[in-house]
Amino acid sequence: MEKRIIIMTESSKFSGKCVAGIDVDSGEWVRLVSDDPETHGAIANEDLFYENGRRCELLDVVDVLIVGECNDDIQPENVMIDTSQNIEYVGKASIDDVLEIHPAENLDEILGNKYSYILEQKVNTVGYSLALVEVTDLEIMEVEIGRASCRERV
């Protein structure tokens, strides 16, 4: 089965990437995972290139061949992709296009609480692991984590 998604996130995961987006047809979140148990389903960097050699970017609209649902209680958005096939570039979306398909979620809590972490006993009860939220009062602070190292914290 093929899904058309708008790429919304890409982050590092083991030696690969964690990639998620919005399903254009359903408006639901989709996280792309591989069948590689050593990387816990991370998508290899080479699997994020189109046939023409261009690399997938945020807000790209792509067609991806899905080989199955993952049935993961903690990350119910996970779908297994066929990594033997290139993802196919369809076009570029704007943030307005995304919000038309999937409006920002109005949540009092993210992942079931107001903290930057989730308790282990609560993780199976949340029912989602991805959310699109509108931030109205963002504050970025520089935090010292060692003698010569600083890090930003939101």
Where are these regions (language model features)?
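N-terminal ordered "arm"
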Residues: M1-V64
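Generic preference for hydrophobic/aromatic residues in regular secondary structure cores
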Residues: I5-M8, V19, R31-S34, V79-V90, ...
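A structural detector for beta-sheet-dominated domains
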Residues: L65-V67, D82, M141
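Intrinsically disordered, low-complexity linker/tail regions enriched in polar/charged residues
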Residues: K114-I140
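Short peripheral tails and domain-boundary helices/loops at the edges of structured domains
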Residues: M80-Q121
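Residue-level detector of conserved catalytic or cofactor/ligand-binding positions
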Residues: E144-V154
